[in-house]
């Protein structure tokens, strides 16, 4: 056997030393390939290790069902606030701000925290989410100017967070809505607000400006995640896309409740939806009423959850039942997505969604506790 190998080496014109060198190189190359193949999963996981640990720690501090029930059982808004003051995550902000503003600050801090720690490949979507604070502050400022609030009342509406907070705070003495819009020149929101300004001037209502900001936010959010190159980004795209679909549905349902036409709604709908594509959205916008919007969703993943809410809608004619059903669906969908990549994006999506739900539920409880004698059983029904 050895003689045959030696003969083959000689016939190839190689010396024994050259052959040995080639063998060593081959072993190194094969070894490198094996290392790359086996280490790739580790390389994919590594960027998520620290962020996942951070959000898991915070997730452990979220209220469980027992704690939420205890909060519902508080007798009034004062007891409600005292309960939250015993929770480190809420204690500091509640010492300085009223409860509604404190909850908004907690939400803003959550977005900023996740945008800061998220791995680079998915960070852009969470950065966009963190901009909701600036957008909400702009909307509050526009509303304040529309209804003629004082400077003090206007400042109370602003959430002391976000990139533009100080700039917006300096505009509380602006002369009116148009002055606010022109003063935002140089920000990323300038163009979208200026484009919507003629509609405001024709109608005298800031709804056109607010809706333009909402659409810009959804466009930015969808654009930030629309290249699902790997499983983590695919999950992110599903999470973001579902948010866009639900925002479109809420807008269409509200519009049909107010008997608005296709032409009234279309400018504010994001046509590039996720599962609800342009043709389907067009059909829904052309529906004559809320009931036909719901029936028009047959065959989509939103059909069952909204159909189940129809009975309550028929009882009280309140579209709040649909909005709650959609919020609950988003929460359930996020929970399902969070389990698909436990060593990747999963914990991040799970935490953000659960924190959003917690804050929404706390706001529901706070509003109810301001009404004397509001039944606790009714509050539990209202929670997401």
Swiss-Prot record:
Query: Could you confirm whether the keyword DNA-binding appears in this record?
Result: no
Q: Which membrane topology describes this protein?
A: Peripheral membrane protein
The UniProt entry's sequence similarity note says: Belongs to the V-ATPase V0D/AC39 subunit family.
Q: State the organism named in the record.
A: Methanobrevibacter smithii (strain ATCC 35061 / DSM 861 / OCM 144 / PS)
Tell me which Gene Ontology terms the entry assigns under biological process.
Answer: proton motive force-driven plasma membrane ATP synthesis
Question: Molecular function (GO) terms listed?
Answer: ATP binding; proton-transporting ATP synthase activity, rotational mechanism; proton-transporting ATPase activity, rotational mechanism
Query: What's the protein name?
Result: A-type ATP synthase subunit C
Q: Name the gene for this chain.
A: atpC
* Source organism superkingdom: Archaea
* Biological function: Component of the A-type ATP synthase that produces ATP from ADP in the presence of a proton gradient across the membrane.
- Which InterPro entries does the UniProt record give? ATPase_csu/dsu_sf, ATPase_V0-cplx_csu, ATPase_V0-cplx_csu/dsu, V-ATPase_V0D/AC39_subunit, V-type_ATPase_csu/dsu, V-type_ATPase_csu/dsu_dom_3
Quote the cellular component terms of the Gene Ontology held in the record.
Answer: plasma membrane; proton-transporting V-type ATPase, V0 domain
């Amino acid at each position: 056997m050895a003689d045959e190998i030696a003969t083959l080496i000689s016939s190839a014109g190689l010396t024994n030393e050259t052959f040995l060198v080639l063998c060593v190189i081959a072993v190194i190359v094969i070894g490198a390939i094996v290392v790359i193949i086996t280490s790739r999963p580790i390389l994919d996981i590594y960027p998520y290790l620290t962020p996942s640990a951070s959000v898991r720690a915070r997730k452990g501090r979220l209220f469980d069902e027992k704690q939420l029930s205890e909060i519902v059982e508080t007798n009034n808004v004062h007891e409600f606030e005292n309960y939250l003051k015993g929770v480190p995550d809420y204690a500091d902000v509640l010492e300085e701000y009223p409860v509604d503003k404190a909850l908004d600050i907690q939400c803003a801090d959550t977005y900023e925290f996740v945008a800061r720690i998220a791995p680079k490949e998915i960070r852009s979507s969470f950065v966009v989410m963190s901009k909701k604070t600036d957008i909400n502050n702009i909307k509050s400022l526009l509303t304040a100017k529309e209804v003629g609030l004082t400077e003090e009342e206007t400042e109370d509406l602003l959430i002391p967070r976000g990139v533009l907070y100080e700039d917006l705070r300096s505009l509380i003495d602006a002369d009116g809505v148009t002055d606010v819009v022109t003063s935002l020149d140089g920000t990323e929101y300038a163009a979208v607000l200026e484009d919507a300004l003629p509609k405001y001037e024709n109608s005298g209502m800031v709804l056109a400006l607010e809706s333009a900001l909402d659409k810009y936010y959804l466009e930015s959010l969808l654009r930030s995640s629309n290249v699902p190159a790997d499983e983590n980004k695919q999950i992110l795209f599903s999470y973001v896309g579902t948010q866009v679909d639900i925002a479109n549905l809420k807008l269409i349902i509200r519009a049909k409740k107010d008997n608005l036409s296709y032409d009234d709604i279309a400018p504010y709908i994001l046509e590039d939806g996720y599962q609800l594509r342009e043709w389907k959205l067009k059909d829904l916008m052309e529906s004559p009423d809320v009931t036909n919007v719901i029936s028009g969703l047959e065959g989509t993943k939103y059909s069952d959850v909204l159909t189940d809410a129809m009975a309550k809608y028929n009882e009280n004619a309140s579209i709040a039942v649909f909005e709650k059903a959609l919020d609950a669906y988003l929460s359930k969908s996020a929970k399902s997505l969070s389990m698909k990549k436990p060593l990747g994006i999963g914990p991040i999506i799970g935490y953000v969604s659960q924190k959003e739900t917690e804050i929404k539920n706390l706001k529901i409880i706070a509003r109810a506790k301001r009404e004397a004698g509001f039944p606790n059983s009714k509050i539990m029904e209202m929670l997401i």
